[in-house]
């Protein structure tokens, strides 16, 4: 069972894609969706606005959940399938400036997502203990399975960063999740989404 920080999180996570139970052999990477021109430092400034229901200003595939200095007054959603190398209990850690929320699914879909870590305001880069809810409770993850992971990040002004780390079997202290454990979820990239039929001339 995933621990839920629903009272601390925005609790308005919307799906970037439907996801599939059997992810097959997805491509490595993380989908980064960016919305620009949004003031405020709270995640709710992004998720509670109508703009979050519209197409992102920009969509990229990045190699990791470790980014910095993308600009001011923007919001971001990062989507990936997480696959651990060894079965066991893992903790996930979140660091960001400004605020962020870390959500994890029970499988490769977004059907049962839980908010497992948060940053309110900001934390120092790669500091996993500035705030009490930056680290998740231990979560049992099985090798070979995919788990849908989402980070919602909101930046107002000044320096900005967002990172996700893990600890677990043979990983005694937090390290940035390696790119070898992150994969692009099917259906998230714009070219993967169904397009309306072209109108006849």
Q: Where are the model-predicted features located?
A:
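Acidic/polar, compositionally biased interaction segments
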Residues: 17-201
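Bacterial N-terminal signal peptides
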Residues: 2-12
